[in-house]
Amino acid sequence: YNYYQYDDYNFDSCTAKGVCATDPTISSLQEVIIMYLKQLAFYTLKLKKRGVTNKVIKDNIINTLSGLVSNTDYSQEQFKNIIMTIYENLRQSKILYERICKDNNVTAEKLESQLKVDKQLDLNEAIKQGEKEFIRKNKLLTAKQRHLYEIMFVLIKNVCINLIQLNSYNKNCEEAYYSMLHLLNMINYRKVSPDKLKKVIESFTKINYKLIRMLHNIEIETFGIPETVEVSFSTRPHKAVLVSGSNLKELEAVLKATMNTDID
């Protein structure tokens, strides 16, 4: 793989020692998924303007983005299934958009795909395609653009995680979802100036903040105002469940499942 050929790649001692490194194969598959997701964002937004929405596709986009970077334990078969699901969403959305435009005598805007996939997707070919996309990005984008796109992707992932948590309370935020799609769609265009990207990022952070406040208020309504309490750090040999994360509804589910059991 050619990931480390570029001088400005962040290949520090942490990566060199394998502590924080990501398997190049996994990175390639992630690139493929991102390519399909940003194209799917394009057609989802076009369909939204035509009054067409799809909750299944919405859930697929949010769930894929929220777990894409945080979970590198996916097997290659799981990645293949994700790729095929997103590709099928993309294919159907593109066909529907073009049909609606044709029925309304409107010229359909096109977004050319760099990847060609069919029902018999070959995983090795997908890995090669992902590597080519990584190299292509490094050639076409300036260092500043790449860094800004990385910031955008972190924000996109963060919003998706917050949307999933919000959904656990049977709530949603369409403004945050479609703003996230607009941000993801911008990655389709290579000639966006850094200044414009900065303005878009700044605007999106405000929407994300509103989403965080919404989630915080719902948590208070559900569980009450957080209080400072003493927590024992003592341990004992016993059955226990180790939990991590910030989703209080998931924690509640664990506590209910272990209630009146011999588990700490």
PLM segments and residue spans:
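Metallocofactor- and cofactor-centric catalytic cores in central/energy metabolism, strongly enriched
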Residues: Y1-D264
